[in-house]
From Swiss-Prot:
Family annotation (PROSITE patterns): ARGC
Signal peptide feature range: none
Protein name in the entry: N-acetyl-gamma-glutamyl-phosphate reductase
Record lineage: Bacteria, Bacillati, Bacillota, Bacilli, Lactobacillales
Compartment annotation: Cytoplasm
Reactions this protein catalyses: N-acetyl-L-glutamate 5-semialdehyde + phosphate + NADP(+) = N-acetyl-L-glutamyl 5-phosphate + NADPH + H(+)
The keyword NADP is assigned to this record: yes
Amino acid sequence: MKVSIVGITGYSGLELVKILNNHKKVELVSIHATKEVGRRLSDVYPYLAGVCDLKIEDFNAQEIIEKADLVFFATPSGVASSLAEEFVQADFPIIDLSGDHRLPADVYQEWYKKSPAKKMILNKFTYALSEYTDVKGKKFIANPGCYATATELALIPLVAAGLIETDSIIVDAKSGLTGAGKALSESSHFVNVHDNYMTYKLNHHQHIPEIVQTLQAFDADMPEIQFSTSLLPVNRGIMATVYCKLKKDVAVSDIASAFAKAYDDKPFVRVQENLPELHNVIGSNFTDIGFAYNEKTNVMTVISVIDNLLKGASGQAVQNLNLMQGWDETEGLHMTPSYL
């Protein structure tokens, strides 16, 4: 299968290159960006020498359609919404890593503060959390966000089984700096990040409606959640710490059983006896989940960790590609966590 990447110079686009280089069923045939056009990717990023020597091209939808069988959009929010229409009209498959096709138009505009994609285009897309969405044969995939992936995988088994008081959910989520993308900002300057820890977008992070929307598919009465996001002084990784109260007569063993039922046959979710750490998933497509119960407060704490650029973006995108095509779900994704 031949694929193209739009948004090659961003972190997620570069991670896609590395993954696809080891994918037995995929050939990367073109890469596109608005910067460094005409230069070889390996000249711009020497660590990719011998991995990808393709020249960066301007975006041209028709040329991509002629060369490839599918396109990945690894672009900032607000880009894919304006570029995807030509592909949809041509019935040409898309996996969009941005948030542009995850939410209804009015919700997207409220939370992203950008013009949404046309409703007829949005209706074509399937929001695809790999462990829960049947995407075989689908053509247009909205890849979940990084915070959303970690949080949803932690909560869905408990919400679906009716084990927790859904109005008690509080999520304290933390991300490494790459989660904010490559665009420079005050919060991304080294001197502001190093030896520092800060909360940002409190109550206003754009992944909040995505998480609630997904959980409501498992419990229609699911209310809003309290969700905070903070910036860790690390390069990559997300830790979502979820607090919730158990319903009456629910035992800790019921929680363990719910996670086992949900994930025992899922190759990229590991339910751990010990509490998860970022180092154990960095550089991989794994999600590690652990939990602990406080009998005095009746609060269950669930911790979910992922690599935001892999399971939270490019890794899950390739996982969805594999599932779309009916291939082995793990193809191209046999990355051992780097740990250090």
